[in-house]
């Protein structure tokens, strides 16, 4: 598969995992060395504000975390638009710029959690395909960015 098509597929697979509440499918996206640092809000450009949501990838721990999230929240809408895909000259690294507009609602109706903005998803080519190395959150950039 062409690398650009492969990156598009993994972005779409991640979205499909959210929409179907499929923790196992979501786990297929992650690189074994991913660590998930995350901004607490969409304008936290300064990493001094960020939190560490998940330590180094551990399949069982991450699966339990995702399954709990999927059990507690339902997706109201999920629109993701790929704006740019860049493949390294060596063909073994890539990133995708994705505009995200996702709204989650607690299944008990008590709260909503919007995830809106632009993400840069960073990938490495592994023997079993492309895997996400990092995504530093979904940020809202100034107009015209």
Please give the residue ranges for each predicted region.
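Short beta-strand edge/turn micro-motifs at domain boundaries
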Residues: 95, 111-145
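Generic short beta-strand segments
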Residues: 33, 98-105
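Short helix-adjacent coil turns
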Residues: 14, 20-22
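A solvent-exposed, acidic/Ser-Thr-rich amphipathic alpha-helical stretch
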Residues: 4-5, 23-90, 113
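Short, cysteine-centered beta-strand-loop-beta hairpins and adjacent loop/turn segments enriched
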Residues: 103-113
